[in-house]
Amino acid sequence: MPTISQLVRKGRAKITKKSKSAALDSCPQRRGVCTRVYTTTPKKPNSAMRKVARVRLTNGKEVNAYIPGEGHNLQEHSIVLVRGGRVKDLPGVRYHIVRGALDTAGVEGRTQRRSKYGAKRPKK
């Protein structure tokens, strides 16, 4: 516990909060170009082929971003919109690609939680 005179001389050290999505530079989303689209396997208890893209953002940073939903149309040189949000069972994947924005198509045949996957309202 510091004395009052020590606090007058030095003051309290400010605790700086580290961003969980530093590559976005305090922006809600960023545009980027896919440099590689691939699948990878998740951590131990889970088993799947997760779809991931390596994206070069407009600020020059390269990130790994998850492609949500079933099926996608992304390939190298696709323009995508990247938002924050990590994938718990994929180490190093701290961003999500926004479905239904720019070159990324929405998920086909999706009827529930459509807005999260860029799917249009189905015809009756």
From Swiss-Prot:
InterPro entries: NA-bd_OB-fold (IPR012340), Ribosomal_uS12 (IPR006032), Ribosomal_uS12_bac (IPR005679). GO terms for cellular component: small ribosomal subunit. The keyword tRNA-binding applies. GO terms for biological process: translation. PROSITE patterns: RIBOSOMAL_S12. One of its GO terms (molecular function) is rRNA binding. The modification 3-methylthioaspartic acid is found at residue 89. Keywords: Methylation, Ribonucleoprotein, Ribosomal protein, RNA-binding, rRNA-binding, tRNA-binding. The keyword RNA-binding applies. Transmembrane segments: none annotated. CDD domains: Ribosomal_S12. It comes from the Bacteria. Residues 1-24, 105-124 are annotated as: Disordered. Residues 9-20, 112-124 have a biased composition (Basic residues). NCBIfam families: rpsL_bact (TIGR00981). Belongs to the universal ribosomal protein uS12 family. Part of the 30S ribosomal subunit. Contacts proteins S8 and S17. May interact with IF1 in the 30S initiation complex. With S4 and S5 plays an important role in translational accuracy. Interacts with and stabilizes bases of the 16S rRNA that are involved in tRNA selection in the A site and with the mRNA backbone. Located at the interface of the 30S and 50S subunits, it traverses the body of the 30S subunit contacting proteins on the other side and probably holding the rRNA structure together. The combined cluster of proteins S8, S12 and S17 appears to hold together the shoulder and platform of the 30S subunit. This is Small ribosomal subunit protein uS12. It comes from Christiangramia forsetii (strain DSM 17595 / CGMCC 1.15422 / KT0803). The gene is rpsL.
